[in-house]
Structures are given as C-alpha cells and as structure tokens.
Design a protein with these regions (language model features):
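Rossmann-fold cofactor-recognition segment
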Residues: 42-54
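C-terminal helical subdomain
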Residues: 158-159, 163-164, 179-210
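Active-site helix of classical SDR
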Residues: 108, 142
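N-terminal Rossmann NAD(P)H-binding glycine-rich loop of SDR-like oxidoreductase domains
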Residues: 10, 14-18
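Substrate-binding pocket helix/loop in short-chain dehydrogenase/reductase
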Residues: 84-85, 92-94
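Conserved NAD(P)H cofactor-binding loop of Rossmann-fold oxidoreductase domains
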Residues: 76-82
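Active-site loop immediately N-terminal to the catalytic Tyr-X3-Lys motif
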Residues: 131-137
C-alpha cells in the first residue's frame, strides 16, 4: 500500500486529496492545525502548524512512526489576503509568505529523511502570473517563490517534483479576496481527481489545471 505524508490536510483541497488518496488505496498521514476535522477521513492524524519549525519537526518524527518511508510528500497548506502594499502590516505579509512558501520549505526539509529513495514531492501552487493584482502582492510573490524552491529542490534531491497550478477552486479562499468566484471554478474534489491522474501519469515540473 503506498503511503502519503500530507501537510495542510484540513483545507478544502487538503481534505479532498485525503479522500481521493485513501479511496485509491493510499495510507495517508494527515498533518493539520485542525486534526479533529480529519479523523473521519484517515486514522493517521497529527496536529501541527506549518509556520512553527518545532511543531513541523515533531510532526515529521511522529509521521515517520505511522507510515515511513513515504512514497509521496504533498504540501497543500496556504493562505491569502487582499491588502495593498502600502497598507500591509509586516505580520500579514509574513503570514502569507509562511503559509505558501516557508511552510513548504520547513515541511519538505523535515520530511526528506522519511521519504523513499524514489518518492515524489507535490506542492499546490497557483497560476501566479494571473494573480499579480492590486492587493495580492504577498500571495503572488509567495507562489512564484514556491516554484523556484520546487525547481531547486528537484535539482538537489533528483526526485520528481510537481507543482500543481490550479485555476479557480471553490474553497473558502474566495471569502478573503474582493473578487467573485468564476462560474467555471473547480470543486476541490474535481481538482483532487485531476491531481491523482497527474500522479498516475508521472507528471513533473509545473502543471496548469484550469
């Protein structure tokens, strides 16, 4: 049975991925700030905040005892805010960068010792070129940085790395931005299905999912 270490599991996309992965036969260790929301989806749940290095390290060690070595590392944590640069408190800037970029670094670093030699790493990114809009400086910068980090990580580890760049997805993110959700927005479940298909097809690099 393949095993997956999923960070940011309680978000809309994270939950959908947990459901799809378990349905496809994966043993999923789900790490989340809200573990109670995940217990109905997988028996292997760990509480941790990806912005806190000690919690990330402890969670990775706990996860190792539940399913290591892992076949798949998946980072689905993220956050967004709509704040113009001149009005952005440094704490909010740091929060968005941490959720989308620094957390990816922290969790990948802590997880690498517990991955199989041929493991895959997947990060949930964004089509950031289309998000360079007033109020989204932190989010767009973080997602652009995530792609650069993922590329370097691939070169360092020589493992297959995939950055998923979804279009609009129907999640609570839309409540945090002053835009209307497009009518063509994917459901988290539909996105998760497409991600699993990409994994089955051994996709790597950047993958746009409109």
């Amino acid at each position: 049975m393949p095993s997956t270490l999923l960070w940011g599991a309680a978000g809309g996309i994270g939950k959908a991925l947990t459901q799809q992965l378990t349905a496809s036969g994966h043993a999923v260790v789900a790490v989340s700030r809200h573990p109670a929301e995940m217990k109905a989806l997988t028996p292997h749940v760990i509480a941790a905040d990806v912005s806190q290095p000690p919690q990330v390290s402890a969670a990775a060690r706990m996860a190792a005892g539940m399913g290591a070595p892992f076949d798949l590392f998946l980072y689905a944590a993220g956050d967004i805010a709509s704040l113009k640069t001149a009005e952005t408190p440094p704490a909010d800037w740091n929060r968005i960068l941490t959720a989308n970029l620094t957390g990816a670094f922290l969790t990948a670093q802590a997880s690498l010792p517990h991955l199989k030699a041929d493991a895959r790493l997947v990060f949930i990114g964004a089509v950031h070129e289309r998000l360079r809009l007033p109020g989204l400086a932190a989010y767009a910068a973080a997602k652009a940085g995530l792609e650069a980090f993922a590329e370097v990580l691939r070169k360092e580890t020589r493992l297959p790395v995939l950055v998923i760049r979804p279009g609009a997805v129907d999640t609570p993110f839309w409540k945090k931005v002053p835009f209307s959700m497009p009518k063509h927005a994917l459901s988290p479940q539909a996105l998760a299905e497409k991600i699993l298909t990409a994994l089955e097809e051994d996709k790597t690099g950047l993958l746009d999912i409109p």
